[in-house]
């Protein structure tokens, strides 16, 4: 979703997708997905341990993606100046980590509250 969403947003602004960042969005999504697939939030349980794993996965994925992957791809694909892209990467990594943990965490928590727990329904 990150790959498609990022590419479509770039296109909707009337430009050409910035492929290094589109690829990084996909990388972050894959890493977070691999980390969090075993949390089983679809069962309606998002306890402190799961919140911690979710937060850690997002921070690790975003920091590696935006501080390493995106700047390196910017340099390789677009010949951008290293100092500029690594500075952008640090800002993006930190801001995306905070956003993903806070907004993403609240969305997952809200989602788990909508799920009926096993055995919570009585047969009449």
Residue ranges, per PLM feature:
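Interfacial aromatic-anchored transmembrane helix boundaries in multi-pass membrane proteins
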Residues: 2-38
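Membrane-embedded alpha-helical hairpins and interfacial helices in multi-pass inner-membrane proteins
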Residues: 15-20, 35-124
């Amino acid at each position: 979703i990150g790959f498609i969403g990022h590419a479509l947003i770039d296109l909707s602004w009337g430009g050409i997708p910035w492929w290094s960042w589109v690829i990084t969005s996909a990388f972050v999504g894959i890493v977070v997905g691999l980390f969090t697939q075993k949390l089983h939030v679809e069962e309606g349980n998002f306890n402190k341990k799961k919140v911690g794993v979710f937060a850690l996965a997002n921070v690790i994925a975003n920091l590696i993606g935006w501080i390493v992957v995106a700047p390196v791809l910017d340099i390789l694909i677009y010949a951008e100046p290293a100092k500029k892209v690594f500075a952008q990467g640090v800002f993006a990594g930190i801001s995306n980590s905070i956003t993903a943990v806070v907004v993403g965490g609240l969305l997952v928590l809200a989602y788990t509250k909508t799920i009926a727990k096993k055995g919570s329904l009585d047969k009449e």
